[in-house]
């Protein structure tokens, strides 16, 4: 095995676009015969009693771009910074509103993302 460290692999993956990362995950699934969606299926099969306490405080939030507002270019820049998408992908997200920009993030991260988008002139919803 070569002298590549785990940190170098993590840094390389962190520099990938969402599209590149998606393709990378598909290749890994094919190579090793696994599915990244398997844990989700296991959670869906859990007993309904475990999901009963619906009054629990929500810990994961989604940031949804409702409208880019008047300053679309500034919103695209913020979307790129928040998501790591390329220019084309970020523009498609902004043009295709409403669109989910971040999923299952902490409350602080969701509020910070919403704040940045609102400052750029976008209409944002945090669910």
From Swiss-Prot:
Matching NCBIfam families: L12
Known role: Forms part of the ribosomal stalk which helps the ribosome interact with GTP-bound translation factors. Is thus essential for accurate translation.
Pfam family, one: Ribosomal_L12
Protein name, per record: Large ribosomal subunit protein bL12
GO (cellular component) term, any one: cytosolic large ribosomal subunit
Basic and acidic residues biased stretches: 104-127
Renumbered residue ranges of the record's region Disordered: 96-127
Keywords: Ribonucleoprotein, Ribosomal protein
Family the entry assigns: Belongs to the bacterial ribosomal protein bL12 family.
Molecular function as annotated in GO: mRNA binding; structural constituent of ribosome
InterPro entries, per database record: Ribosomal_bL12 (IPR000206), Ribosomal_bL12_C (IPR013823), Ribosomal_bL12_C/ClpS-like (IPR014719), Ribosomal_bL12_oligo (IPR008932), Ribosomal_bL12_oligo_N_sf (IPR036235)
Self-association state and partner proteins as the record states: Homodimer. Part of the ribosomal stalk of the 50S ribosomal subunit. Forms a multimeric L10(L12)X complex, where L10 forms an elongated spine to which 2 to 4 L12 dimers bind in a sequential fashion. Binds GTP-bound translation factors.
GO biological process: translation
Organism in which the protein naturally occurs: Oleidesulfovibrio alaskensis (strain ATCC BAA-1058 / DSM 17464 / G20) (Desulfovibrio alaskensis)
Signal sequence bounds: none
Chain segments annotated as coiled-coil in the UniProt record: none
């Amino acid at each position: 095995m070569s002298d590549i460290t785990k940190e170098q692999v993590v840094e390389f993956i962190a520099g990938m676009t969402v599209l590149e990362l998606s393709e990378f995950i598909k290749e890994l699934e094919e190579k090793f015969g696994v599915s990244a969606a398997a844990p989700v299926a296991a959670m869906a099969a859990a007993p309904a009693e475990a999901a009963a306490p619906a009054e629990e405080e929500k810990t994961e939030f989604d940031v949804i771009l409702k409208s880019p507002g008047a300053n679309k270019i500034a919103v695209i820049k913020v979307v790129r910074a928040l998501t790591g998408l390329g220019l084309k992908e970020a523009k498609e997200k902004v043009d295709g509103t409403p669109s989910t920009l971040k999923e299952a993030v902490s409350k602080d991260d969701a509020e910070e993302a919403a704040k940045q988008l609102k400052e750029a002139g976008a209409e944002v919803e945090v669910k």
